[in-house]
A protein has these predicted regions:
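A short, hydrophobic beta-strand/beta-hairpin element that forms part of a small beta-sheet core
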Residues: 53-63
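Thioredoxin-like thiol-disulfide oxidoreductase module
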Residues: 33-50
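Conserved beta-strand scaffold positions in the cores of enzyme catalytic domains, especially
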Residues: 29-31, 61
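Local sequence-structure signature of Cys/Sec-based thiol-disulfide redox active-site neighborhoods
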Residues: 1-25
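ATP/adenylate-binding site constellation spanning eukaryotic-like Ser/Thr protein kinases
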Residues: 9, 49, 67
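Catalytic phosphate/metal-binding cores of nucleic-acid and nucleotide-processing enzymes, i.e., regions
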Residues: 24, 28-29, 41, 74
Length: 74
């Protein structure tokens, strides 16, 4: 299974829900706080996203709490 990258920010409810869903479904991931990592923030913005969470798995990416997308990688 390809490892995901989860871009988050503090106090983000959808970020917590996405993290919980990835963990529950056994999808391995690295979490990156975009408020502390400016390169990560620039990357997320370059993908066209302006809100967290952003999930990147291989060439696929999305924003927001999307359990339907997580299921595709289980």
């Amino acid at each position: 299974m390809t490892k995901a990258t989860l871009y988050t920010k503090p106090g983000c409810v959808q970020c917590k829900m996405t993290k919980k869903d990835l963990t529950k479904k056994g999808v391995p991931f690295d979490e990156v706080d975009i408020t502390e990592d400016h390169d990560a923030l620039s990357f997320v913005l370059s993908l066209g996203y302006k809100q967290a969470p952003v999930v990147v798995i291989g060439q696929t990416h999305w924003s927001g709490f999307r359990p339907d997308m997580v299921r595709k990688f289980v």
